[in-house]
Amino acid sequence: MELDHIALIVSKEENLAFYKKLGFIEKNRIERGYDTVVFMECDGLLLEVFIDPNHPARVSGPEAVGLCHIAFVVESLEEVMRDVECEEIRTDWFGRRFTFCRDYDGPPIELKEKKNTPEDGEKNR
């Protein structure tokens, strides 16, 4: 099994700039009468972004049952944090550095840093 894509609903076009700062590139755009669908890609990961100001705002707290957040792996947290406002960098249970940020509509997005292991020299997540 593999992940095909992640679908997001955003309230305005300006949200695309956030994902572009993470390295996503717009690949296709479909203008429909009631919304716009933008397909963005970064390193083989596809985002399907629905731009529609008529959807209700996300319930932000307390968190409800369902999807909690999405996480992207980046080369360098410091590099991303030059362009994107994030929380402080922390370390998870496995020793990986991570942080959280939000797009302009506010859903939490986790950023994890790629890490080289001295044992095998290969990158892992």
Please state what every model-predicted region is.
Residues H5-A7, F39, H69-A71, F98-F100, ...:
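Short, conserved structural micro-motifs that define repeat-unit consensus positions
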Residues E63-E88:
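Mid-chain, well-packed structural core segment of small domains
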